Amino acid sequence: MKKITKILKRKFKNFNPKLKEECGVFGISDNQDASTLSTLGLHALQHRGQEGCGVVTFDGKKYHSEKRFGLVGDNFNKEEVLKSLPGNFAIAHNRYSTTAGTTLRNIQPFYADTNTGGIGVAHNGNLTNAITLRKKLV
């Protein structure tokens, strides 16, 4: 491992071998239990973010979203998830904030209905080209 780290430090100027953990992101597609499985995935990633959590599902016609402050296990139970998050596609996110305030609005995933359909997004980090993406998507 030391040899690999040495090579990477030489090749990549800003290489840092220390583990950096930020938000947890989980996705699942084409499964009738997508919301339940995605919350289980978030539970497994809980160590990556404990500020808030959210799930966005898509049922083929409409997006559904639940976002809450706190831990996954405290906010999502199977009955609740199945009722409010129908669909065969889901993305889920645990928040560990590095920028922006601690508000419900900043908990991911984000989704939007646009003139070309819709989109759901969860990311681990900062979108450095957010303005460009917005112009192309909205």
In which residue ranges do the predicted regions lie?
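N-terminal glutamine amidotransferase
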Residues: 1-131, 136
